[in-house]
């Protein structure tokens, strides 16, 4: 594995596949970590029976991010105006043509929290660790291979 991650959905689906493969076949799944094994890539790897790593590999980055860019100020400076015609007030909230409202930001934060909880649960199950231990490691940062091993990742 040599990846900084990917999408939450792909990570979840591939983690399920890796876990299911081992259960269906009775064969162990072995992951060899290269330079980086992070985020969704680590979520997938966490389902393996064995994870091999170099001492200096970047492992972990357990966390979730959703980016909504507000380009409205830049568009205004460039003389670009956008009229969004929508079926609901929040339909254009992720288009970047206006700032998020407080309610929209709270909505997206709730989604991130739900997705992150799934990530944490998946890692806890795959590494046979208590959920609270994984949650404590879910800082979004990577660990060196040495520290990841010490932490049970």
Where do the language-model regions lie?
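Secondary-structure end/capping motifs
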Residues: 119-153
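Small-residue-centered hinge/linker elements
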Residues: 1-27, 33-126
């Amino acid at each position: 594995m040599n990846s900084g991650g990917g999408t939450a959905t792909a990570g979840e689906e591939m983690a399920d596949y890796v876990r299911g493969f081992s259960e269906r076949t009775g064969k162990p799944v072995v992951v060899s970590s290269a330079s980086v094994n992070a985020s969704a890539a680590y979520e997938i790897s966490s389902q393996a029976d064995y994870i091999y790593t170099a001492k200096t590999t970047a492992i972990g980055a357990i966390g979730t991010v959703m980016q909504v860019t507000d380009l409205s100020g830049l568009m205004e400076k460039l003389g670009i105006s956008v009229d969004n015609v929508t079926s609901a007030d929040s339909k254009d909230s992720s288009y970047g043509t206006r700032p998020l409202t407080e309610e929209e930001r709270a909505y997206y934060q709730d989604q991130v929290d739900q997705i992150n909880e799934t990530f944490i649960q998946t890692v806890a199950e795959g590494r046979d660790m208590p959920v609270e231990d994984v949650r404590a490691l879910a800082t979004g940062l990577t660990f060196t291979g040495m520290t990841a091993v010490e932490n049970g990742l």
